Amino acid sequence: MHQSRTITYAKAEFPVTTRKMDELQDVQLTEIKPLLTNKNARNFQDFDCQEHDIETPHGVLHVTMRGVPKGNRPVILTYHDIGLNHKSCFNTLFNYEDMQEITQHFAVVHVDAPGQQEGAPPFPSGYRYPTMDELAEMLPSVLTQLNVNSMIGIGVGAGAYVLTRFALNNPTLVEGLVLINVDPCAEGWIDWAASKLTGWTSNLVDIIMAHHFSTDELTDNQELIQTYRLHVAQDINQDNLALFCGSYQYRRDLGIERPVVGLNEDTVNTLICPALLVVGDTSPAVEAVVECNSRLNPTKTTLLKMADCGGLPQVVQPGKLAEAFKYFVQGMGYMPSAGMTRLARSRTTSSSSITSMDSSRSRSNLNSLLEGTAAGNLDNQAGPQTMEVSC
């Protein structure tokens, strides 16, 4: 059963704030002024959206759609992390002015994990929350009932895991993935958080905060921390959140493996779509993202590290992520005539390289966007070459 309701909001007057995949590379972006201020710290609003409750094999999913699917183009489908919902995880990014040019070309589908949406009722006693694999198995029903043929996914943390699992199971439905703070491994993050933070209690809100933010952020960025602590504690049903966290804690390893030419490229379990991995350089997820990077095809994967940025780059640095996403989408052949972002126009770039014929082809579109930038030809076993971008 597919139920929908349409909610239309007035347009916001305030600003609410890359590239084709190539050889494995590590891009570092320096910090610009964070978006979050006292004026708009809780910029979680939806604008011009339709809400849908969609039946799937593992229960009902709450989905919010912005815009209408454009012909045969994919939709941008998002999936949030634990302790968040689509509003708190993605609306700062999608309400940012530089993203508006992108969303003119694509409909956006925000998926809330079961029971995590704003105002969600508690689950009945004895309810079994879907496993992470089952959460991925719910997504084909969303695409089918919204008459969507394919998607470009943006996932954060647990949501990045779900979208990766979905892409592994349904490669023809996924044209590209932006994976923020993705962890491909099976070990539980709760034990990790407890081991890293002495003196902290087992309070779920505290553990969620340790999952999202570095110790420096927890100390130094009080406005951001207070905003999200209140959100986790007050806006998300705590019983439902505990179930989602339990599902994420007991996830399976994704089982992905880097393909080796002439050995296993036809049989290895890995993503076949372009992937952009994103992590702040002080994020608790850095090691996990680097591990994921080491398992993916370097000719289709880019690792982007945001300098001086912590656990929520899409919230703290939406301008940087909007720019990166624009280049990513253009690299897949969409929006070829779109202009540079304001950030790109003010950028200076530097790097060094020797480029092979194959790697030239794989990154030619990217280099045309990052003017004056050349990238290194990297062996599968070599560490990533760093390309520093200042602005």
Predicted regions and their residues:
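Conserved HGGG/HGGXW glycine-rich cap/lid loop of the alpha/beta-hydrolase fold
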Residues: P57-P122
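Catalytic nucleophile loop
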Residues: G159-A160, A322
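Histidine-bearing beta->alpha loop at or near hydrolase active sites
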Residues: M306-P313, P318-G319, L343
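Post-His helix in hydrolase/transferase enzymes
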Residues: Q314-Q330, M335-P336
